[in-house]
Amino acid sequence: MSNTEITAKTQADEAHSFAEYEAIATALLPYIDAAKTGDGELSRTAFYDHAHIVGSVGGEFSYPDADAFAENVSQIGASPDVKSRIAWIDISGPAAAAKVEFINWSGLRFTDFFVLYKTDGQWKISGKVYDSHSNN
C-alpha cells in the first residue's frame, strides 16, 4: 500500500467525522434561523432544558435561561437582513463547541460560543456565552 492510499477504516472514520460536523451545523440552524425570523420558539428547540446562557448586550451582563432567551428573541422580532456564519466547530466524542457570528441582528453584531452535547443521537446546545459588539 502506498502512502497516498486511504484505508477503509480511515474512510469510515472520516465519513463519520464529516457527518458529525454536518449534524452539529444542523443542530445550530434553528437558533440561526430564529435570528432572521424572530421566532423564539424555534430558537428554544436548539437548547436543552438545563442550558446555561450568559453574555452581554451593550456591556450589560445578562444570564437568561433558555425560555427567557426565547422570549427575548420573539420580542426583538425578525431581522431579515441578518448575516451569520459558523466560524468553527470542534468535536470530541459526544461533546462539541462552536462559534457563530452574526452581523445586523437587530442592528447589532454578536459573537456566540456554544457548547453542545449529543444524547440519544441528537446534538443540542448545553451552554452559550455571547457578546454584542459595537453596532455594525
Report the location of each language-model feature.
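Short, low-complexity N-terminal intrinsically disordered segments enriched in polar/charged residues
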Residues: 1-41, 45-49, 62-64
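Short secondary-structure capping/turn micro-motifs that flank functional sites
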Residues: 51-52, 134
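Beta-strand-connecting loop/turn residues
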Residues: 49, 94, 121-122
